[in-house]
From Swiss-Prot:
<dbReference type="GO" id="GO:0006364">
    <property type="term" value="P:rRNA processing"/>
</dbReference>
<keyword id="KW-0539">Nucleus</keyword>
<dbReference type="GO" id="GO:0005730">
    <property type="term" value="C:nucleolus"/>
</dbReference>
<comment type="similarity">
    <text>Belongs to the eukaryotic/archaeal RNase P protein component 2 family.</text>
</comment>
<keyword id="KW-0698">rRNA processing</keyword>
<dbReference type="InterPro" id="IPR038085">
    <property type="entry name" value="Rnp2-like_sf"/>
</dbReference>
<dbReference type="GO" id="GO:0030681">
    <property type="term" value="C:multimeric ribonuclease P complex"/>
</dbReference>
<dbReference type="GO" id="GO:0001682">
    <property type="term" value="P:tRNA 5'-leader removal"/>
</dbReference>
<protein>
    <recommendedName>
        <fullName>Ribonuclease P/MRP protein subunit POP5</fullName>
    </recommendedName>
</protein>
<keyword id="KW-0819">tRNA processing</keyword>
<dbReference type="GO" id="GO:0005655">
    <property type="term" value="C:nucleolar ribonuclease P complex"/>
</dbReference>
<dbReference type="GO" id="GO:0000172">
    <property type="term" value="C:ribonuclease MRP complex"/>
</dbReference>
<dbReference type="GO" id="GO:0033204">
    <property type="term" value="F:ribonuclease P RNA binding"/>
</dbReference>
<dbReference type="GO" id="GO:0004526">
    <property type="term" value="F:ribonuclease P activity"/>
</dbReference>
<comment type="function">
    <text>Component of ribonuclease P, a protein complex that generates mature tRNA molecules by cleaving their 5'-ends. Also a component of the MRP ribonuclease complex, which cleaves pre-rRNA sequences.</text>
</comment>
<dbReference type="InterPro" id="IPR016819">
    <property type="entry name" value="RNase_P/MRP_POP5"/>
</dbReference>
<dbReference type="InterPro" id="IPR002759">
    <property type="entry name" value="Pop5/Rpp14/Rnp2-like"/>
</dbReference>
Amino acid sequence: MVRFKSRYLLCELCVSEPSSLHLFEDKVVYQALRGAVNRAHGDYGAAIFNITLGVLVKYLNAHTGVVLIRCRKAHYRLVWSSLPFITFLENRGQKVRCFFNCIHVGGTIRTSQKFLIKYNRQQLQRMLLDCKTDAEKQDVRKAILSCSLNLIKGEETDGSDDDGDEEDT
């Protein structure tokens, strides 16, 4: 049995109106990604995307705008370089201007999840500086503490930090 090595692109979907995030589904992101690869890399990109790329939107959180895209290891740069060409997503007849911010490239879903926890904790710490009232600060501190406790519990049970990010050339 052959194992296909994959890369996971953890992206942040940035939109002008956060209320429009609930409109998106994974197939909308997939179609936009397919079109972007076609525009950026032409016939070669379209052929690679359809035949060998193995692109799949594994996770889309409509509340936070986090997208996890899986693609083959040999061609992940093709997808990665096409992300800036996505300027809007269209769903149910509505076009929403957006862009993708790739925040992590990992070898497994697990390493991407670990990075996302660390990233969210950093974002919460930045939010703490912007809080104006003591109640807001207390809520953000509780959120930071809950992220930290979950991370510590996960590291105690895991024991390994190997993410398999080595590349074959």
